[in-house]
């Protein structure tokens, strides 16, 4: 039986996403986790690619959660 596997999400990717979602800022998430802003941005991008859906709307240098982002944050 051939099963389609869901992407394996790493805890690091989820930690970065949750911090960014909590602060609605990659910069503040990076400060909280003691990493660079670009590291958080890349983690979120990787997570979005794995899920095949955007998690944030990037509007005028601000972040807003998409519906998928809201659902993942609450999970």
Residue ranges: model-predicted function:
Residues 1-9, 15:
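A detector for short, charged/polar N-terminal pre-domain segments
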Residues 10-13, 37, 69:
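The N-cap/first-turn positions of alpha helices
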Residues 15, 41-42, 57:
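Base-recognition residues in the alpha-helical recognition helix of bacterial helix-turn-helix
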Residues 17, 47-48:
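Conserved amphipathic alpha-helical core elements
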Residues 19-34:
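Short helix-boundary/capping micro-motifs
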Residues 26, 48-65:
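A short LG(V/I)-centered, amphipathic sequence patch enriched
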Residues 31, 42, 49, 70:
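Alpha-helical residues within the helix-turn-helix
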Residues 36, 43-46:
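Residues within the DNA-recognition helix of helix-turn-helix
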């Amino acid at each position: 039986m051939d099963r389609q596997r869901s992407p394996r999400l790493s805890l690091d990717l989820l930690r970065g996403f949750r911090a960014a979602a909590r602060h609605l800022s990659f910069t503040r998430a990076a400060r909280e986790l003691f990493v660079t802003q670009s590291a958080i941005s890349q983690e979120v991008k990787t997570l979005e690619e794995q899920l095949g859906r955007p998690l944030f709307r990037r509007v005028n240098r601000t972040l807003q959660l998409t519906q998928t982002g809201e659902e993942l944050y609450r999970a």
